[in-house]
């Protein structure tokens, strides 16, 4: 993948070139979410793949007069008889006085991503990110694993050869990311990042319409001819940003580093020596006594 430079001047410039029916120019829009964890003076930022945008719709949202603040100090927005709460830290705009242009995206969801059915962006006061459902109801954005930690969303352009195709049209020994079920739309084979399924065998009897797919675990599963698959691998994590760390810590994607010897310095090694250097004793006039 090749990542283009992100421009936050105007959302219309970011969305320029996206075909509502799908990308025909070989350039697709992917969305990434960024989660940050901090322990002491160490700050780690994870950037993950979120989904691929298929189409988008633009509409104007005007907060009603019933909007205000509740007893907990949250922003409340009334829409179609339902009240949705927002944290003050998530939004830098006053939703009671400003018009908000929202962009609702329909996308191909990553199986390991959080179960959202759309993302909307506001063009007033910079690019603000608000998740929406299929009925365009605003909701609060939080991490499913940790309800105390919030994350932001970024829109970037990428060059990718990944696209959706019917499994009946692709050849054998083709890597696919996941096989969605045509009945309920859920993926049958949710793969870890960086891995893929392998289309292995095809049944010669066309009336059966069965194809065997090899999973990364080595097992084979039988799928139907009517399923559509996402070609290519699931994109791995882009990068992990971490500041100055000590030797011996697991910071590189969970791989334990090999530290040879013990450095007598507590900054470079957790088993280090003194907090300050050992200097020779000096007299009040600055001369060494020994």
From Swiss-Prot:
Subcellular location: Hydrogenosome
UniProt-listed InterPro entries: Ribosomal_uL2_C, Ribosomal_uL2_CS, Ribosomal_uL2_dom3, Translation_prot_SH3-like_sf
GO aspect biological process, one term: translation
Gene Ontology CC: one annotated term: hydrogenosome
Major localization listed first in the record, in broad terms: other
Keyword Ribonucleoprotein: yes
Keywords: Hydrogenosome, Ribonucleoprotein, Ribosomal protein
Single annotated GO MF: structural constituent of ribosome
Coiled coil (residue ranges): none
PROSITE patterns named in the record: RIBOSOMAL_L2 (PS00467)
Protein family: Belongs to the universal ribosomal protein uL2 family.
Quaternary structure annotation from Swiss-Prot or TrEMBL: Probably part of the large ribosomal subunit.
Identification of the protein by name: Large ribosomal subunit protein uL2m
Naturally occurring in which organism (per UniProt): Nyctotherus ovalis
Taxonomic classification: Eukaryota, Sar, Alveolata, Ciliophora, Intramacronucleata
Gene encoding the protein: rpl2
């Amino acid at each position: 993948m090749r990542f283009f430079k992100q421009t936050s001047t105007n959302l219309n410039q970011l969305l320029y070139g996206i075909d509502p029916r799908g990308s025909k120019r070989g350039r697709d829009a992917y969305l990434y979410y960024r989660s940050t964890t901090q322990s002491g003076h160490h700050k780690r930022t994870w950037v993950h793949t979120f989904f691929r945008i298929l189409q988008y719709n633009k509409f104007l949202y005007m907060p009603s007069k019933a909007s205000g603040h509740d007893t907990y100090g949250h922003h409340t927005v009334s829409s179609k008889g339902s009240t949705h709460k927002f944290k003050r830290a998530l939004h830098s705009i006053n939703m009671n006085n400003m018009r908000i242009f929202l962009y609702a995206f329909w996308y191909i969801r990553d199986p390991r991503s959080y179960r959202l059915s759309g993302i909307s962006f506001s063009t007033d006061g910079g690019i603000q990110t608000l998740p929406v459902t299929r009925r365009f109801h605003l909701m609060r954005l939080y991490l499913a694993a940790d309800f105390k930690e919030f994350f932001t969303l970024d829109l970037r352009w990428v060059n990718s050869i990944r696209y959706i195709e019917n499994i009946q049209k692709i050849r054998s020994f083709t890597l696919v990311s996941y096989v969605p079920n045509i009945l309920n739309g859920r993926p049958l084979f949710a793969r870890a990042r960086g891995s893929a399924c392998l289309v292995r065998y095809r049944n010669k009897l066309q009336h059966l319409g069965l194809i065997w797919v090899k999973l990364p675990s080595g097992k084979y599963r039988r799928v139907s001819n009517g399923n559509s698959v996402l070609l290519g691998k699931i994109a791995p994590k882009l990068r992990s940003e971490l500041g100055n760390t000590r030797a011996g810590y697991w910071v590189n994607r969970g791989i334990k580093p090999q530290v040879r010897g013990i450095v007598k310095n507590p900054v470079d090694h957790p088993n280090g020596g003194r907090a300050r250097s050992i200097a020779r004793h000096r007299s009040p006039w600055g001369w060494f006594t020994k």
